[in-house]
Amino acid sequence: MSLRLEKFFGAWMHEYKPDYGSAETGLDRFVAYCKAAEFIGKSAALATREAGPERQLCAFVVAAEDTDVWGDEPIWIEDTVVGFVTSGGFAHYRHKSVALGFVPSDWARAGLEVEIEILGARRPATLVTEPLFDPAGVRMPA
């Protein structure tokens, strides 16, 4: 999955798993709520969509030193853990450490400064909304 982190693409059982709803992960646009057919969880998904998700999947550029995030690292705002990293690593195209993780929707805005704990040390990170590679999606493979 080359350039996955640079494109902010999630992966199954990391960003996309039964613990997270479609509104939280940004996959809501793929759910056909308008169809008459029922599916398990439709009423809950509709309620979350209408009320807005409690948390959102976000991308962070991390000021890592010699170790990158891997997954399950806490995301701190001041002295409070507000979320956890779902996956991350070194983005070779931009030469930056990138993390994907969930934070409360109220905090999910570009430029948010957080800290991500890596091996017991908190490292500064910035929430980014624009993919680091091909933000317009023009280089997507056919």
Show the residue positions of the predicted features.
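Conserved, structured C-terminal
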Residues: 1-142
